[in-house]
Amino acid sequence: MKIVASWLLLTAVLFTFAAEARQTINGCEIKRRASCPGANLSGANLTRSNLAGADLAGADLSGADLSGDRITEANLTKANFSNANLSGAVLSNTYMSGVNFSRANLAKADLSQSTLPGANLREANLAGANLSLANLKGTDLTGANATGAVFAMASLVEANLTRADLTGATLIGADLRNAILVEVKYCNTTMPDRSINNSGCLK
């Protein structure tokens, strides 16, 4: 029994150590409140990491896997997430001015109450994403897949949504002043005034 108890204790200690072990990539320690401005994390596997409160301004995370990550209240100013996987990631209350999310996978990600003025979201996958109360002023959403996305009370002032797919999206209370809405696909889309737009549904 003592041998079994000792083995269980050792296993628990090793498990705890592994859980607390921190990954360091190119000098950047992956942890809460990490200070890694300009870091090169391209192609890194950072799945389910906790980067809440981190400073990743100007960092290169192109092609990185950040699925399921927690990156709340972080500074992602001008960071590069092109072609990155952020599906299911939590990025609420995060500052992302000028961030590059082109062709990134943000399916079911939470970007609520985040600040993304001038962000590049060209051809990004925003299916089922939550962008409620987000500041998307001047963002480029050209060709983005926003099916089922929620933009409730979001600011899309001067945003470019050319060829964006808003099938099943919710835009209740969203501000679309001076937004570019050329060839946008509307189907079962809830508009800012709560009306349903089915103009793009296949007949």
PLM feature spans:
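Sec-dependent signal peptide recognition
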Residues: 2-10
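N-terminal signal peptide c-region/cleavage motif recognized by signal peptidases
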Residues: 16-18
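Tandem repeat scaffolds
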Residues: 20-203
